[in-house]
Each structure stands twice: as C-alpha cells, then as structure tokens.
C-alpha cells in the first residue's frame, strides 16, 4: 500500500495546467515529527526544554483538576490561578521578543477573561461538559503561550 497519493494534470479554466502535486497521508506527517523536533532541538535546545516543561506542568495541573475532590471547597477558578502561576513562572525561563512584563500582561488578561467566563460556562454546560472543555482550553492556552514566546 502506497503512502503517497498522486494527482495528475488538472486543466484550469484559462487552459493552464497544474503540475502533479502530492497529498501526504497522516502517517507521513507523523513520520516527519521527529525530524522536525530534532531540527528545532539542534537550532535552539532551550525551546525543546521549555516545551517539555510547559507540557509537563500543564499535564500535572490538568490531572489535579480532574481529581475534583481536592478542589470542591476552593472552586473552579482556583485552577485557572494555578495555571496562570505555572505559565508566568515558565515565562521567565524562555524570554524572546517581548519583554517579560508585556508577556505577563497579555497572558494575565487572557486568563482573567477566561476565569470570568468560567462560572457562566459551567452553569450552561454542566460538570461533564465542563471537564471535556477543559482540555481544549488548556491546549489553546499552551498555544497562546507558545505564540507569546515567538520573536517579532
């Protein structure tokens, strides 16, 4: 079974022809991930180390959040505070482009906005849906954190 799908010449409206192009299957994309990670690690090992730190800390905080018996008396906004502290502390170890104060202001504003909307979302969606929505929010927050670390 071939991993590559070839598409032949396609005639366009103006008579121009598109040359063959290749569509990669997901297995090919997955095979390229280690090579990309290796090249990023060779260029700047701090980025890889920082990514592992962020991923590990957000995973631990997420696991603590799913053990709701620890947080019944505190409330759901406490977890957002913990995640903010984790993100802000890790900001000091990988500073590129923006200054630390600009990054902290941007990340705190985004997390504060989400914390303010949290009780309304919980009432609307219920506890089960809230737990399911927490993971994509964490991923989006990690991506936002990564974007904030990009130089201009």
From Swiss-Prot:
UniProt-annotated location(s): Membrane
Q: Which GO terms describe its cellular component?
A: membrane
Pfam families this protein is in?
ALMT
Alphabetic keyword roster: Ion channel, Ion transport, Membrane, Transmembrane, Transmembrane helix, Transport
Q: Tell me which InterPro entries the record gives.
A: ALMT
Function recorded in the entry: Malate transporter.
* The protein's name: Putative aluminum-activated malate transporter 11
């Amino acid at each position: 079974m071939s991993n590559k799908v070839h598409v032949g010449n396609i005639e366009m409206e103006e008579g121009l022809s598109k040359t063959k192009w290749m569509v990669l299957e997901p297995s090919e994309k997955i095979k390229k991930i280690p090579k990309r990670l290796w090249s990023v690690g060779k260029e700047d090992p701090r980025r890889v180390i920082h990514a592992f730190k962020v991923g590990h800390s957000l995973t631990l905080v997420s696991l603590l959040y799913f053990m709701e018996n620890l947080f019944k008396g505190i409330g759901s906004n406490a977890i957002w505070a913990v995640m903010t502290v984790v993100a802000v502390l890790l900001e000091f170890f990988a500073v590129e482009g923006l200054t630390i104060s600009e990054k902290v202001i941007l990340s705190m504003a985004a997390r504060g906005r989400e914390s303010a909307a949290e009780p309304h979302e919980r009432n609307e969606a219920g506890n089960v849906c809230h737990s399911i929505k927490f993971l994509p929010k964490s991923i989006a927050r990690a991506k936002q954190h990564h974007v904030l670390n990009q130089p201009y």
